[in-house]
Amino acid sequence: MANSKFGYVRQFETHDVILPQCYIVVRIDGKKFHEFSKFYEFAKPNDENALKLMNACAKNLVLKYKNDIILAFGESDEYSFILKSSTTLFNRRKDKLATLFGSFFTSNYVALWAKFFPEKPLNIKHLPYFDSRCVAYPNLQTIKDYLSWRYVDTHINNLYNTTFWQLIIKCGLTPQESEKKLCGTFSNEKQEILFSECGINYNNEPEMFKKGSLVTRKGEILHINVIAQIDELFEGY
């Protein structure tokens, strides 16, 4: 950068750095994706192509930074990228990690859109974009708990959304009626409603919907019981 008498303004810039020895999670979330998915008529409760598009973007990001990323996990319109505690990527700067991961993911989403939605060209007034946050986690157990949290959240959200939408699609309920019917119900009760009233066995739903998607450093996309394999996933880290 050229020197000039105006260069003093750089003194006002701040660069937060993630503490050393901490694991780093960069989590990306679709911004206003409720409106976005409605405009492009995503299938409810899950749009398989939309999820596969998210997975493709995540895979490209993981492979780009495979020396720093342990794994990535995604559900719906979010993805979490877990970085090694020893990473020096972008000098561990919070702003760089959050903005570059977010922009890389967004650009891939736009570039790959036509592959997954060839009959739905992107509208300039309804473009996808993602927010991104960067969080430090102090030890291995905490990062395992983080991934377990996102995995459990996937199950809870998908079971609710599946039951909610099937009551509307198959049973003719209004959104308000479906919400009221599910209010206060537990997981086993939702599964019973799905089976007895909608004729759907939740256990037979696609693994990607129920378990989310995990991307390994090699770019493999898996749909597994994360909690059952949590120690194996972080072996050596």
Curated annotation (Swiss-Prot):
Cofactor: Mg(2+)
Keywords for the protein's UniProt record, in alphabetical order: Acetylation, GTP-binding, Magnesium, Metal-binding, Nucleotide-binding, Nucleotidyltransferase, Transferase, tRNA processing
EC number: 2.7.7.79
Coiled-coil parts of chain: none
Effect caused by changing residue 160 to A: Significantly affects the G(-1) addition
Binding site for GTP: 32-34, 44, 47
Keyword Cytoplasm: no
Residues bound to Mg(2+): 29-30, 77
One MF annotation (Gene Ontology) recorded for this entry: tRNA guanylyltransferase activity
Substrates-to-products reaction catalysed: a 5'-end ribonucleotide-tRNA(His) + GTP + ATP + H2O = a 5'-end phospho-guanosine-ribonucleotide-tRNA(His) + AMP + 2 diphosphate + H(+); a 5'-end ribonucleotide-RNA + a ribonucleoside 5'-triphosphate + ATP + H2O = a 5'-end phospho-ribonucleoside-ribonucleotide-RNA + AMP + 2 diphosphate + H(+)
Effect of residue 202 to A: Significantly affects the G(-1) addition
Subunit structure: Homotetramer.
Similarity annotation: Belongs to the tRNA(His) guanylyltransferase family.
Known function: After addition of G(-1), THG1 removes pyrophosphate from the tRNA 5'-end, generating 5'-monophosphorylated G(-1)-containing tRNA which is important for recognition of tRNA(His) by its cognate histidyl-tRNA synthetase. In addition to the single-G(-1) addition reaction, THG1 polymerizes multiple G residues to the 5'-end of tRNA(His) variants using the 3'-end of the tRNA(His) acceptor stem as a template.
Protein name: tRNA(His) guanylyltransferase
Phylogenetic placement of the source organism: Eukaryota, Fungi, Dikarya, Ascomycota, Saccharomycotina
Protein's gene: THG1
